[in-house]
From Swiss-Prot:
Organism whose genome encodes this protein: Homo sapiens (Human)
Known EC number: 1.14.15.15
Lineage per the UniProt record: Eukaryota, Metazoa, Chordata, Craniata, Vertebrata
Protein name: Sterol 26-hydroxylase, mitochondrial
Main location group: mitochondrion
Modified residues annotated as N6-acetyllysine in this record: 283, 509, 520
Pathway listed: Hormone biosynthesis; cholecalciferol biosynthesis; Steroid metabolism; cholesterol degradation; Lipid metabolism; bile acid biosynthesis
A Gene Ontology term for the protein's cellular component: mitochondrial inner membrane
Residues binding heme, per UniProt: 476
Length: 531
């Protein structure tokens, strides 16, 4: 769940400023062009006392803005921004500069460079400015959440939200809740199979996984089932689902278009309307939980209250006020849906194309959890291949193909000295497909993640080649529950069905619609296995 839509959208602008001057005098003034040549370096890998020539920033290639806009709007890369990473790395190498107005951005496209920056992060790592999200919060007097706040306040908020989520043992507490939602998912899957012409096909798995992920994360965060997996979805839930799409779809226009267009064109209003509906739905769920807690207090007194879940814990323990919860939980919700739904879609797509890996996974799953039994969190310690399938999927399709950091102090990277407030852009998509980090990088090879794999198996050659959940204190807050959620559902599916790609689906390509999604509907056939 690391990073969100605005990060991807703003990366599009990092390739170029809003003006047509590629890097004018103001941009050059942001960072000194030449650096002292005799200062000792503190770069990772440099031994004590090692001195080497520091490099001039003039050596770093610059991305021309006209080229970027031509590729974006004329050549059609607006939905292929991740592929621009591939083109730019081939042209400029693993590091290049681009500008957003006077602000310089340093794009990094190799695992060693990412590692150097990540290992020098401060106590309060700073993401790119979530300006559009903050504008909505400010207009409606809402508190900032974990993705919109920074500094010490972010640290305090993160410490509160970490509880009941961050540790594996804490995430395991949600196993029963996830399995309850998975039971309903399996029922809905069978209903859709039965309704298909073949009796075994689901025509749009990405949508079904999206509804599953939304149902699951709402149940975890708000302790409320919202009916996404029912035959007839409640009207307020339908409105909520549409509002998420409305917000994300109009984020692109809200990012690219100048502010003077907001009263004239409809996109900004639609963007705000989407957020308003999201927060309205969240407020309703929080208010219902507060009423439930008050009813318990009246009925049983303070000692009789049973803390039932995440939101209840945060409110009852005083970790968050209701107003703070209102600012934070919708942001966690936004991060929690796409990771699960997209990763599971891509995982089943690749498993359907590789029956040998799918059969090996089936044997592993039923060897630990026989048919008819429900997997539990402890079972996954004995399912290394299942974990490897998810890791390999996230390597090929990092949910958000870019991320960023604004450094809090002067740091050295690859011999270049960058001052405080430099913004680095992490090009995760091209890094995770780099042959120097992963052998046979374009192939789906889950066995590369297994310690006891055969010598001929493709290997992992750099630990920072794939970091889909981030690194350090700002790593993904919900990583453990996202992993558990995906493991539980994937195990159930492979335990019960053989998954086959529907003939009409064909080859898929990834499209950058905020996150990396398939370019068309993913139809899959689920053939029930014989016990």
């Amino acid at each position: 769940m690391a990073a969100l839509g605005c990060a991807r959208l703003r990366w599009a602008l990092r390739g170029a400023g809003r003006g047509l001057c590629p890097h004018g005098a103001r941009a050059k003034a942001a960072i000194p062009a030449a650096l002292p040549s005799d200062k000792a370096t503190g770069a990772p890998g440099a031994g004590p006392g090692v001195r080497r020539r520091q490099r001039s920033l003039e050596e770093i290639p610059r991305l021309g803005q006209l080229r970027f806009f031509f590729q974006l709007f004329v050549q059609g890369y607006a939905l292929q921004l991740h592929q621009l990473q591939v083109l730019y790395k081939a042209k400029y190498g693993p590091m290049w500069m681009s500008y957003l107005g006077p602000q310089m951005h340093v794009n990094l496209a190799s695992a060693p460079l990412l590692e150097q920056v990540m290992r020098q992060e401060g106590k309060y790592p700073v993401r790119n400015d979530m300006e559009l999200w903050k504008e909505h919060r400010d207009q409606h007097d809402l508190t900032y959440g974990p993705f919109t706040t920074e500094g010490h306040h972010w640290y305090q908020l993160r410490q509160a939200l970490n509880q009941r989520l961050l540790k594996p043992a804490e995430a395991a507490l949600y196993t029963d809740a996830f399995n309850e939602v998975i039971d309903d998912f399996m029922t809905r899957l069978d209903q859709l199979r039965a309704e298909s012409a073949s009796g075994n096909q689901v025509s749009d798995m990405a949508q079904l996984f999206y509804y599953f992920a939304l149902e699951a994360i709402c149940y975890i965060l708000f302790e409320k089932r919202i009916g996404c997996l029912q035959r007839s979805i409640p009207e307020d839930t339908v409105t909520f689902v549409r509002s998420i799409g409305l917000m994300f779809q109009n984020s692109l226009y809200a990012t690219f278009l100048p502010k003077w267009t907001r009263p004239v064109l409809p996109f900004w209003k639609r963007y705000l309307d989407g957020w308003n509906a999201i927060f309205s739905f969240g407020k309703k769920l929080i208010d219902e939980k507060l009423e439930d807690m008050e009813a318990q207090l009246q009925a049983a007194g303070p000692d009789g209250i049973q803390v039932s879940g995440y939101l209840h814990f945060l409110l009852a323990s005083g970790q968050l006020s209701p107003r703070e919860a209102m600012g934070s939980l919708p942001e966690l919700l936004m991060a929690g849906v796409d990771t699960t739904s997209n990763t599971l879609t891509w995982a089943l797509y690749h498993l359907s194309k590789d029956p040998e890996i799918q059969e090996a996974l089936h044997e592993e799953v039923v060897g630990v959890v026989p048919a008819g039994q429900v997997p539990q969190h402890k079972d996954f310690a004995h399912m290394p291949l299942l974990k490897a399938v998810l890791k390999e999927t996230l390597r090929l399709y990092p949910v958000v193909p870019t991320n960023s950091r604004i450094i809090e102090k002067e740091i050295e990277v690859d011999g270049f000295l960058f001052p405080k407030n430099t913004q680095f852009v992490f090009c995760h998509y091209v890094v995770s497909r780099d042959p120097t980090a992963f052998s046979e990088p374009e192939s789906f090879q889950p066995h590369r993640w297994l310690r006891n794999s055969q010598p001929a198996t493709p290997r992992i050659q750099h630990p920072f080649g794939s970091v889909p959940f981030g690194y350090g204190v700002r790593a993904c807050l919900g990583r453990r529950i996202a992993e558990l959620e995906m493991q539980l559902l994937l195990a159930r599916l492979i335990q019960k069905y053989k998954v086959v790609l529907a003939p009409e689906t064909g080859e898929l390509k990834s499209v950058a619609r905020i996150v990396l999604v398939p370019n068309k509907k993913v139809g899959l056939q689920f053939l029930q296995r014989q016990c």
